[in-house]
Amino acid sequence: MPSLSEETNGRIERLMPGATIGIIGGGQLGRMMALSARYMGFRIGVLDPTPDCPTAQVADFQVTAEYDDIAAIRELAEKSDVLTYEFENVDADAIDQVRSLAAAPQGTDLLRVTQDRVNEKRFINDHGTPTAPWKAVNSVEELEAALDEIHYPAVLKTRSGGYDGHGQTVLKSEADLEQVRARADHDGSFLPSILEGFVDFAFEASILVAGNGKDYVTFPIVRNEHRNNILHMTIAPAEMDETVAKEAHELALRLAKGFELAGILAIELFITKDNKVIVNELAPRPHNSGHYTIEACSFDQFDAHIRGIAGWPLEQPQLLKPAVMVNVLGQHVAPTRALIADHPEWNVHDYCKAEVRHDRKMGHITVLTDDTAKTVADLEATGCWDDLKKA
């Protein structure tokens, strides 16, 4: 991915206040991007099919259309100086078609890599970074051969699409394999997929790295807890061996330089019981596990993303205070709102979504603390998240 100056052949060295940033996707990530950009003086446009979506509520204008509507993407580009996106399932070809109208400093190479799990794994491995063992599979026959090599337990994922556990099948035994056989086409084929071996991890973690196409900085490594395949809680910083932390920062910088990163990249990690760092997935955008940075860091992930795509300089972010971030899903809206008056320490973020649904991310709460373990216990003791209690 080029810097903004390279993307525009020197026409724009850096984006200045008053310029317009067009965001593809109008959910909470786009909303928080837009809020950061507005503080810096930028105008905001958004493309989203839902009128008055969360991003549109804080934007200057909205193009209301589907994400793959090339005419709508062109309209957004014509009204913008720079394009960015809040999720990775964006039509990369469509972005390439409008780059003469608006710069796309993130480029499309990173999009194409992260849209295909096989390409993603290859890129990560080619840059000297370990992943779980994996094999590309397109049929039951190929799956059986891959299982002979990787063994149970393993997880079968579609090569593209899927989030929060969607498009995934856990294989623990022959009985699970039989279910895949039953769903396959008559010739044994199924959607292009990847089989990944299970990692015996101590905990899940993530690290954010930001770049402007030339310079790169990393945020603290955080510990993540998922429940029902959805991120539940992030603890910053993660308590871990300094050598392991250094390795994680180095691999993040290595991947960022490999992409010539402009904007932010989230790297989901497994930290194994023998202190190895394994990369799970990449996300070429701000990440749920980085929301704590809004209160806890010298500048947050959304600031870093906007500065990166605008060609502004980047300073190494500092953790000002440890923090715990917990997601507020649809079923948690009522109980958390009922307790807001009792918890002045809660930094409450509501995404202003029109429809409240079970398991839908509606907001988050961040607590700054000197004792993350106590804060975790205090949050759980409220009972707001009892439906997500560990089995």
Task: Give a label for each model feature.
Residues 1-122, 126, 141:
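ATP-binding N-terminal substructure of ATP-dependent carboxylate-amine bond-forming enzymes
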Residues 2, 113-206, 210-228, 232-255:
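Active-site nucleotide/adenylate-binding loops and adjacent lid/helix of ATP-dependent enzymes
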Residues 3-9, 307-391:
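Peripheral (often C-terminal) accessory segments that flank ATP-dependent C-N-forming ligase machineries
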Residues 55-56, 159-161, 356-360:
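Short, flexible turn/loop "capping" segments at secondary-structure junctions
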Residues 184-240, 246-279, 283-291, 307-316, ...:
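Phosphate-binding core of ATP-grasp and ATP-grasp-like enzymes
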Residues 293-295:
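A conserved FAD-binding loop/helix module that cradles the flavin
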